Design a protein with these regions (language model features):
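Contiguous, often N-terminal, cationic amphipathic patches that form binding interfaces
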Residues: 1-45, 49-52, 61-63, 67-72, ...
């Protein structure tokens, strides 16, 4: 199973997040997910906010076009991004 699906202008990502890291960055693949380290603690939604802002920046879309579909309180998350023509594979190349 691939860590992302892409159709028209929608990208769906399967993520494994690691909150409380030194900096927010892509850390490679983790099974069938993209691993993302987050420089925010997993309290009061701070890690989710950090993730949404990072994805908004990485995919060059407004924050309102990034939505958390599942995994609000889990390390495994599914996120949908609309309106980006960026290839998700580019996240792995830095």
């Amino acid at each position: 199973m691939e860590w992302f699906t892409q159709s028209d202008e929608r990208i769906t990502l399967r993520l494994h997040v690691q909150p409380g890291a030194k900096k927010t960055e892509v850390a490679g693949l983790y099974g069938d997910c993209l691993k993302v380290r987050l420089a925010a603690p997993p309290v009061d939604g701070k890690a989710n906010d950090c993730l949404m802002r990072a994805l908004s920046d990485w995919f060059s879309v407004p924050l309102r076009q990034v939505s958390l579909k599942s995994g609000e309180t889990s390390r495994r998350k599914v996120v949908e991004i609309s309106g980006s023509n960026k290839n998700p594979q580019e996240l792995l190349s830095g």
